Amino acid sequence: MSSWVSHLPADLSIREVIGHGMNATELDANPRLDRWFIQNLNRDPVLPLSDAAVDAVLCCVGVQYLTRPLEVFAEVRRILRPGGRVIVSFSNRCFPMKAVRLWSALDEAGRASLVATYLEGSGFASIAAYLLADGKAGDPLVVVAGAARG
């Protein structure tokens, strides 16, 4: 799930990066994407990728806008190879009018627990949360990650 920037290190060698987003201009401007697709996951959570097609899925600051998170993460699980990783990152920054109500009512720990619940309910294992930046020197950054069972 991406936009004009993928937040992937420039020196990280990846065979293929497939992007998802809502804005064709932004996705087209992202140099890390080999290919991309536009889809409103709140309307249609079925991802246009084959079963067990990818090794990892990154969701960067988008989880707070999902109205059908269990369906979306079940799809993420479907497209991941067994043992593949899902990595969900978020901050305390968002568009409050677009974020789901529950997200806005929770603190960072509550949001991490919520994302972990989404992943567990969608068939992921080895779920863990990490505080990568505490927010003292800028925006906080939280990651919740899990592995596809199977």
Whereabouts are the PLM-identified features?
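A short glycine-rich, Lys/Arg-flanked "PGG" loop and its adjoining helix->strand segment in the class I
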Residues: L70-R85
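Core SAM-dependent methyltransferase catalytic element
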Residues: S122-A125, L131-G150
